[in-house]
Structures are given as C-alpha cells and as structure tokens.
Amino acid sequence: MKNNKKKYALVIILILFIAFFSSQCMMTRTNTESKKTVAVILPYTYNKENSRILDAIRDYAYNNSIILDVWHEKSLSSNKLASIITKEEQNHAIGILLIYPENYLTQQEKHYDYDNVLAITATMQTAFSHYATFENSPSPSYLLPVSARVIKKIQDGKTDCIYIKNTYKLGYESIQMLDTYSRNNHMKDIYIPCQKVDKAAIESGKLDALLTN
C-alpha cells in the first residue's frame, strides 16, 4: 500500500514538473516572438558621433523590446546592400537603419528606393526615400558633448554663441520612426534642429542636462 502511495506521489510530481516546464517554454517562446528586430548598418570605425547615435538606438530598443541586428561595414556596394536588406526582410526585421552610409556605400550617386530603410545622413539625403538629418544652422556647430573650454568662451563673452547637434536625439527619433512604421506603414523624413547656446541660455540652467551629457 505504501509503495502504491509513493508511486502515485511520484507520478503527480512528474506531471507537475512537466506542466511547469511546458508553461516556461511557452512563455519563453511567446516573449521571443513578441520582440521585433531592427537591422542597423554603420561604419566599421567608431567615432563620437556614431557612438552617441548607437547609444540612443540601444536605449530605445531596450525599452521597447526590440532586437538589434548590427552590421559593421568598411565598404558596401549597392548589390551587397540589397542582399542585406533581403536577408533582413526574410528574418522579419521591421526596418533597416543606415548610419552615415556616405562612409561605406561605394555607389553614392544611385537612388536607393526602399520603403523600409531610413538613412541617418549628412550628405546623401537625395539618395534615399527616407532619411534623418540635422537642419542647417549658422556656424560654428558642435556635436555633444561640448567641451568645458568652449562653454567657458561663451560665458566669458569671447564667443557669442554656438549651435549644438544632439546626435543622441537623432538616433532615438530614427529608430522610433522605424518602430512607428512597423505599426502604421508610414515613414517620414526627420529633421533635428540644432540648439542655439549663448551666455543667457547657459546662465538660465535650462541646458544643464543637455550640455553635461
């Protein structure tokens, strides 16, 4: 009798274990399937500008359950780009983000007509159907972060003002646009205004968070 009770107990434990394991597998599969993928193609060599753009892209991806498929390219022909885009579409990527393609595309005179591609670019706006860029601003313009030496010149009156390019914002709004495109199938160009920084703006403290990043 005791042996039968032990057998029943073992069977119940085994059933509970199988049920728990199955539920965990289903949860893992559901969580994986719910995540979206964005392909990011960027120059092989990092610099301050690319780094802050990528930081923003990673932050948005983390906060919105997006997987990033990152490509580092030294040189990329139009055929190789088409091949990458086809591969990413087959993997159900919601979009492809090109970071400064002028630094790796070998055929810059072509028009790259892709609805699901957004190019962050300073010089190739006409080459893409959709792009993100900074608005034109009077010089001098600086990338964030701005050095303390430059800020001090403004505070001392040696420089009237400068204009800063927020590359983090550029990257963040770019991946956000691709995410939005995946839901409503509508993409539009992005223009990020340059922020004017003068003595009054610095002394007001309104730009503290921006300038210290």
Residue ranges and their predicted role:
Residues 34-38, 148:
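Nucleotide donor/acceptor-binding cores
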Residues 51-54, 58, 78-85, 105-109, ...:
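Extracytoplasmic/secreted envelope proteins and their assembly/folding machinery
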Residues 115-128, 136-158, 197-198, 202:
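Venus flytrap/periplasmic-binding-protein-like
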